[in-house]
Amino acid sequence: MKKLILVTSPPACGKTFISKQLAKALNHVVYLDKDTLIPLSKQIFAVAHQPYDRSSIFFEKYIRDLEYRVVLDLAMEALEYDDIVLINAPFTQEIRDLDYITILRAELKKKQAELVVIWVDTNPKVCHQRMIDRASDRDMWKLNHWDEYILGVNFNPPLSLKLENQPDSLLIFHNSSNEEFEESMKTIVAQLEAAVADRVEIPRTRY
């Protein structure tokens, strides 16, 4: 059984670093990052004569869902050619929408694939500092309105996604310290390796 892995969490929890390390550790992986689409999204802002603001109503209405649709279309195509596709993206709304997840799982089943959600669990104070340190233009509104922003962010894992008959349906990656990262990395790589090996013969991971 092939796997579509979504590495998800609120911004600045460490998704990108974790996603890349997981992709390096596993075999037969296609790595996709939704942020790769940002240059195209910036052009939409420019053509529409809108200020570049990924927290704006314009972004939510015309760009956000399109980015997710494109990266998922790429993932579905990639599953035709490899065993695992890993997407680095927040999916903050989608993973709380059980209808969305049900439809996605049904589409994956047609490709003999399963959905794996890896939730990156990070202390909000750590996320705030990481956001300051990375100084990205996409975080400007969040940092300037931190108290307002943080009230609307759900840092709880989406436990409703856990399936009894699929142990790797929801995996929690703790990432508030280097020690948590190392322990979670070893544990989750082993879980993913075992889940894929149960169905597909692949070499051992390199982690």
Feature locations, PLM:
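Conserved phosphate-donor/acceptor-positioning beta-strand/loop module used by diverse small-molecule
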Residues: 109-131
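Conserved substrate/cofactor phosphate-moiety recognition/catalytic segment
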Residues: 17-70, 76
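Small-molecule kinase domains that catalyze NTP-dependent phosphoryl transfer to phosphate-bearing small molecules
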Residues: 121, 132-185, 203-207
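Glycine-rich phosphate-binding loop used to anchor ATP phosphates in small-molecule kinases
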Residues: 62-111
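The conserved Walker
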Residues: 10-11
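Hydrophobic anchor at the beta1->P-loop junction of P-loop NTPases
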Residues: 7
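Conserved glycine(s) of the Walker
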Residues: 14
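Pre-Walker A (Motif I) flank of P-loop NTPase domains
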Residues: 1-4, 82-83
